[in-house]
């Protein structure tokens, strides 16, 4: 994996930085693990826009990723590493000894030909999945379950990881990348190591068209709109905001508290670090 700075042959490509992974599979994905993916374009069931700046983009198939890793004791060989347009991490195609194939999130350092296994007797090696009660304290983990058997929900994006801090009774404490310390049941499963494609955050998109390929539409300033569309809209010629900065629905957008006074999650031991 390497960062490639693109030559400034045009204004759009000036400053563009790509993440190149030469070890990724260049052919088609495994057809049996593909599903249809429809786009909502930010609309709800009434057709109203609920998320702005979404629409268009390249057509994609959803890759069915195994987040449960419940084929215990059956070794699996890594056939290839693949790009997945639906997530920031890369995925790996596993071929189990019984012939079944599954996709998993590719951990850092995983190579084609490696053998992975899951279960309580799996060795502590990157890519293997075990219950948290069988993982040594201090181990770096990713793809962590929040409910036993539900499948991994935490630390799944590129470069993500967590650290197993302690075990107390039926719960363990895990420190996430955000600094949050969270309680997780010891029967929940986690995968050893950290997620690969860790240089993903260093890329530079470079041009607006590349964001349109990803289904992201432009963000229009409120002062450039009409009064019917935004509180900052209207006026003759170029005008300022004429009031405190607000959202299109009138909510102050600079430091205004919007969090509801809801019950605190008792699984959070220590809150994440504030920026």
Curated annotation (Swiss-Prot):
SMART domains found in the cross-reference section: Ribosomal_L2, Ribosomal_L2_C
Biased composition (Basic and acidic residues): 229-244
Keyword hit for Ribosomal protein: yes
Gene3D superfamilies per the UniProt record, alphabetical: 2.30.30.30, Nucleic acid-binding proteins (2.40.50.140), Ribosomal protein L2, domain 3 (4.10.950.10)
Segments of this protein annotated with the region Disordered: 223-275
Biological process terms in GO annotation: cytoplasmic translation
InterPro entries per the UniProt record, alphabetical: NA-bd_OB-fold (IPR012340), Rib_uL2_dom2 (IPR014722), Ribosomal_uL2 (IPR002171), Ribosomal_uL2_bac/org-type (IPR005880), Ribosomal_uL2_C (IPR022669), Ribosomal_uL2_CS (IPR022671), Ribosomal_uL2_dom3 (IPR014726), Ribosomal_uL2_RNA-bd_dom (IPR022666)
A GO cellular-component term linked to this record: large ribosomal subunit
PROSITE patterns: RIBOSOMAL_L2
Record keywords, A-Z: Ribonucleoprotein, Ribosomal protein, RNA-binding, rRNA-binding
Keyword Cell inner membrane appears in the UniProt entry: no
GO molecular function: rRNA binding; structural constituent of ribosome; transferase activity
Record note on quaternary structure: Part of the 50S ribosomal subunit. Forms a bridge to the 30S subunit in the 70S ribosome.
Protein family per UniProt: Belongs to the universal ribosomal protein uL2 family.
Described purpose of this protein according to its UniProt entry: One of the primary rRNA binding proteins. Required for association of the 30S and 50S subunits to form the 70S ribosome, for tRNA binding and peptide bond formation. It has been suggested to have peptidyltransferase activity; this is somewhat controversial. Makes several contacts with the 16S rRNA in the 70S ribosome.
Protein name in UniProt: Large ribosomal subunit protein uL2
Organism: Bordetella petrii (strain ATCC BAA-461 / DSM 12804 / CCUG 43448)
């Amino acid at each position: 994996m390497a960062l490639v700075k693109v030559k400034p042959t045009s204004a759009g490509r000036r400053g563009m930085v790509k993440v190149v992974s030469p070890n990724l599979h260049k052919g088609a994905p495994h057809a049996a693990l593909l599903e249809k993916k429809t786009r909502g374009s930010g609309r709800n069931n009434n057709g109203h826009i609920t998320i702005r700046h979404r629409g268009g983009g390249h057509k994609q198939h959803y890759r069915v990723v195994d987040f449960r890793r419940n084929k215990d004791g059956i070794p699996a060989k890594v056939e290839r590493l693949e790009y997945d347009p639906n997530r920031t991490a890369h995925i790996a195609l596993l071929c189990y000894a019984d012939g079944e194939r599954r996709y998993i999130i590719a951990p850092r350092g995983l190579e084609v030909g490696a053998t992975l296994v899951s279960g309580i007797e799996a060795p502590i090696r990157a890519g293997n999945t075990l219950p948290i009660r069988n993982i040594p304290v201090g181990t770096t983990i990713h793809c962590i379950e929040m409910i036993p058997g539900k499948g991994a929900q935490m630390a799944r994006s590129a470069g993500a990881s967590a650290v197993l801090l302690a075990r107390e009774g039926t719960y363990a404490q895990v420190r996430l990348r955000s600094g949050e310390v969270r309680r997780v049941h010891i029967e929940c499963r986690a995968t050893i190591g950290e997620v690969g494609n860790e240089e993903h955050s260093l890329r530079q998109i470079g041009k607006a068209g590349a964001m349109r390929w990803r289904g992201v539409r432009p963000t229009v300033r409120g002062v450039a709109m009409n009064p019917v569309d935004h509180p900052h809209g209207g006026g003759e010629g170029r005008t300022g905001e004429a009031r405190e900065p607000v959202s299109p629905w009138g909510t102050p957008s600079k430091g205004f508290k919007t969090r509801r006074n809801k019950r605190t999650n008792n699984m959070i031991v220590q809150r994440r670090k504030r920026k």
